[in-house]
Amino acid sequence: MLLWILLLETSLCFAAGNVTGDVCKEKICSCNEIEGDLHVDCEKKGFTSLQRFTAPTSQFYHLFLHGNSLTRLFPNEFANFYNAVSLHMENNGLHEIVPGAFLGLQLVKRLHINNNKIKSFRKQTFLGLDDLEYLQADFNLLRDIDPGAFQDLNKLEVLILNDNLISTLPANVFQYVPITHLDLRGNRLKTLPYEEVLEQIPGIAEILLEDNPWDCTCDLLSLKEWLENIPKNALIGRVVCEAPTRLQGKDLNETTEQDLCPLKNRVDSSLPAPPAQEETFAPGPLPTPFKTNGQDEHATPGAVPNGGTKIPGNWQLKIKPTPPIATGSARNKPPVHGLPCPGGCSCDHIPGSGLKMNCNNRNVSSLADLKPKLSNVQELFLRDNKIHSIRKSHFVDYKNLILLDLGNNNIANIENNTFKNLLDLRWLYMDSNYLDTLSREKFAGLQNLEYLNVEYNAIQLILPGTFNAMPKLRILILNNNLLRSLPVDVFAGVSLSKLSLHNNYFMYLPVAGVLDQLTSIIQIDLHGNPWECSCTIVPFKQWAERLGSEVLMSDLKCETPVNFFRKDFMLLSNEEICPQLYARISPTLTSHSKNSTGLAETGTHSNSYLDTSRVSISVLVPGLLLVFVTSAFTVVGMLVFILRNRKRSKRRDANSSASEINSLQTVCDSSYWHNGPYNADGSHRVYDCGSHSLSD
């Protein structure tokens, strides 16, 4: 028996390859027992692969690998860690899991792969995780999920997929998976079908669906009915309509079947976001993103009726334009100016100006395919196509463009100076694409742009000076991206009136050099970010308080620390958020400012969070010292001045005596040369040199 054990251990070591040894015995990682469980902590060890390491074989353990560089997981990656019961792989930059990577982890019940860069779950991605009950994959770049991705997880109960880029769930994705808790917040879901999706999770006890762009049409009717039939407290949060316009901001549970699916013979009064796209392509005036006096109420996103109350959840800027439905008559219209319209597109005259060319949903893969090139096109719609990149050469013939819609394509690359020829462009839609970086060079030439929509991309970085190329920009839509910070002076030289930053990853925003440049802002949406309610957020809180609720859309909820989780930090006092700062204040000084909760706005990198009515010791002591030094220098200066004046006075007296002696000597000399006494004015003055001594 002993021989068999030795042979088994030898074969395992041989199969493992060049194993360096036990990560605990060789103290490569920190191994400690906590409440009877062994924790193998390999945080931030710089691991790029695990195939050369092993772990204790005599007991079960929790394996912590967060903060390493495990960017790819290959088959049998964890073959030497078969006693692990939980696996934590957060913040590894992980972007690919090769099927078979988890083979050998039959005992793992909890898998944490959140905060990485995973883009897809393929079939057999989780092969080997036979006992998995808990899967956390939030804050990734997840777009595609194979229908068979979870088919091997027959014990999975908790699935956390929030804050990804998921726009749809495939049929039968939950088949044979006993899901009880499902988190889909912060994705791109517009609808959830009942058949082959929702019907497969009958045991649901908790579901989260907030912060998705729900399209409240007939397709969402099945979701509404399903939510009404699950346990009363199963739905956590709200399902808020983002489209159509007439239902935007309304809770799904407050809608009726008639709201979601009006009769066909009734007119749907909702219109897409500015500029409106008419379904029949009838000639009409060029739409604008702002409502002016006399315009139709339905075509004014962001407008508030006179005397009405602005509803935070009904911010019209969130709406994405929807493609118009090209009717048969539109498709068969005669050629414009004797030239045929590009294949599959429809062209119309805009009264008093140029042409409107609609190529929405025409399977266009490149703008170079649009032939023949028409002159004087002012509105170009290319939404819902398959365009992957755009180049400067694509717009050489479109220098008169005023509106360009490239939304919902596959655009990941914008060549520098692509728009340099579009000097008259005022509206640019690039939402629902794959952009990850914005720079000044990409938007060079857009000197008249007023409206830019880049929501629902994968933007992680905005370079300094990006928006300086657009001095007339008024509306900027950046929501539902992957932004964690903004560069200094990002809004310098731009007079934004409306800004959307909701559903990103901001933990705080600096005031100095960023928010303080929004001097013309009238609407800003910041909800759905993981705010860290600590001392660093206090200047931002004060800035938000000055804006007021009529400018700041929606509430701002804390993500951390735990004691403030999901609390609106606008309702928290500064002392609650940053108690250690106020503990340093002199009791005497704080007694005079108990009612003050404002803080000095010095940016998030400063420790001066106190209101101007409060004076800390660190400010008071240097101030008093400065006064003392100034007074001392003043006294010394006065003494020096007095002493100098005295010396000058003595010098003048000495010079006066010397002058008299010289004068007397001159008189005596004069009498000598005249061989007798000198008489001044005859008998009035007589100097007898013989009777005076020069020493007198």
UniProtKB/Swiss-Prot annotation:
Ranges where the record places region Disordered: 268-317
One of the GO BP terms on file: nervous system development
Q: Show the SUPFAM superfamilies listed in the entry.
A: L domain-like
PROSITE patterns recorded: LRR
SMART domains found in the cross-reference section: LRR_TYP (SM00369), LRRCT (SM00082)
Ranges where the LRRCT domain occurs? 212-263, 529-580
Sorted keywords for this record are:
Glycoprotein, Leucine-rich repeat, Membrane, Phosphoprotein, Repeat, Secreted, Signal, Synapse, Transmembrane, Transmembrane helix
| Membrane topology listed for this record | Single-pass type I membrane protein
Q: Where are the LRR repeats?
A: 59-80, 83-104, 106-128, 131-152, 155-176, 178-199, 376-397, 400-421, 424-445, 448-469, 472-493, 495-516
Q: Which residues carry this modification: Phosphoserine?
A: 695
**Spans within the Extracellular topological domain:** 18-622
A GO cellular-component term linked to this record: membrane
Q: Which residues lie on this side of the membrane: Cytoplasmic?
A: 644-696
Question: So which residues are the signal peptide here?
Answer: 1-17
**Compartments (UniProt record):** Membrane; Secreted; Synapse
* Principal cellular location given in the protein's record: membrane
- What family does the Swiss-Prot or TrEMBL record give for this protein? Belongs to the SLITRK family.
Q: What biological function has been recorded for the protein in this entry?
A: It is involved in synaptogenesis and promotes excitatory synapse differentiation. Enhances neuronal dendrite outgrowth.
Q: What is this protein called?
A: SLIT and NTRK-like protein 1
The gene from which this protein is expressed is Slitrk1
